[in-house]
Amino acid sequence: MKSKLIILLTLVPFSSFSTGNNFEINKTRVIYSDSTPSVQISNNKAYPLIIQSNVWDESNNKNHDFIATPPIFKMESESRNIIKIIKTTINLPDSQESMRWLCIESMPPIEKSTKINRKEGRTDSINISIRGCIKLIYRPASVPSPVFNNIVEKLKWHKNGKYLVLKNNTPYYISFSEVFFDSDKVNNAKDILYVKPYSEKKIDISNRIIKKIKWAMIDDAGAKTKLYESIL
């Protein structure tokens, strides 16, 4: 019998999410500050799932500055489990945030897929592995919790030729919930999903005349802030 594996990757900016009603993570970001953080996983299926968790960097490479434990385990149906995040290095910046991705992957046990295929008369076994990834943000002790009314004063938007430039003068990773150019919502905003600390992003606005920017950010709990405005 042939076996195929399909992996679906999900990155979502909500307060919690369900990956195709397969498993649910109770948050969309982990803030690592002075205590060991954790996430709760719920198996919503009527059969067990194999759960594997890893930490990746922003370049989609496995990262060893943090580990997720347990790294792999079996979840019974209609059950919950906790994954803890442990920092394994002291070589992270102490004056600004660092970000990784916590990725959690689920797959039905092989025997479950085999029974389904036999029942349906198929000779191939297809296991669908679903991976959900959430932001893992390390916030050193010297960096206080963000106050967004203060942060907004240090986010600078300006035009430079065909580019709209966003400069982040804060020690925080700033994630955006929504962005408006004048009154038009930016639906394909992959270039401005988030901006790193003390960095800038350029957004190509060729053939557009923009006079005003409105935006909402995402707070530590995954909720949307109020809309802020900047005149260009």
From Swiss-Prot:
Its main location: periplasm. Residues 1-20 form the signal peptide. GO terms for cellular component: outer membrane-bounded periplasmic space. GO terms for biological process: cell wall organization; chaperone-mediated protein folding. InterPro entries: Ig-like_fold, PapD-like_sf, Periplasmic_pilus_chap, Pili_assmbl_chap_C_dom_sf, Pili_assmbl_chaperone_bac, Pili_assmbl_chaperone_C, Pili_assmbl_chaperone_CS, Pili_assmbl_chaperone_N. Disulfide bonds: none annotated. It is found in: Periplasm. It holds the Pfam family PapD_N. Keywords: Chaperone, Fimbrium biogenesis, Immunoglobulin domain, Periplasm, Signal. Belongs to the periplasmic pilus chaperone family. Involved in the biogenesis of the CS6 fimbria. This is Chaperone protein CssC.
